[in-house]
Amino acid sequence: MPPEATASGDSGTGSGGGAALTAAESLTVKGRAPKTGYSRERFGSAWADTDSNSCDTRDDILKRDLKQVKFTDGDCKVSYGVLESDPYSGKEVVYKRGASLVDIDHLVALSDAWQKGAKYWDASKRIALANDPLNLLTVGASPNRSKGDGDTATWVPPKAYRCTYVAAQVAVKKKYGLWVTSAEKAAMVKVLSTCSKQALPTGGNPTNAPARFHAN
């Protein structure tokens, strides 16, 4: 299941990874590297089946996050589902395959990751990040487009989901060894200081994809 929203100042949710605030304070601070050389293809083909369950990553996340799910041809291709409460708007959003009302968001945007360490990785690690369920969330398309590739210093969701969202970004950056800018770290600490017991999410896939996957 994806991280759940928690009220500011409560105990938070998570999988036992410790306090998100403590983890945020431990992240390495560096300047943003140039975006030169970035392309989506550097992170492999979109939605690769890196967990080898015969379903692509996008459908895996839709199945995880939507309710009332219906499939086309078996139990992989999600044709319909309901996002009961969009983390980025609080609204109910209906997913229909081929429509554009729902996105799968990379919590840590791939271009942001590229500028904060991923440009120096091998392809296996970049592919893993792009398909790690820890870094993926089903959201409404409209608010996600407003986020773009912003980090915590430039975009956060409404207050009801803010602590959970920032904790998830911290978890991904810590897991993969990505750095943060000084403004980004300050923003993370500011948010998580309002919910200092917010747990750090854990889990997801290994940080290297199987050798059969390749990226440009």
Residue ranges and their predicted role:
Residues M1-A33, K190, T194-N216:
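N-terminal low-complexity, Pro/Thr-rich disordered segments
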Residues G9-P87, K91, G98:
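Cell wall/extracellular polymer interaction/catalysis modules
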Residues P87-N216:
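Domain-level detector of nuclease and nuclease-like folds
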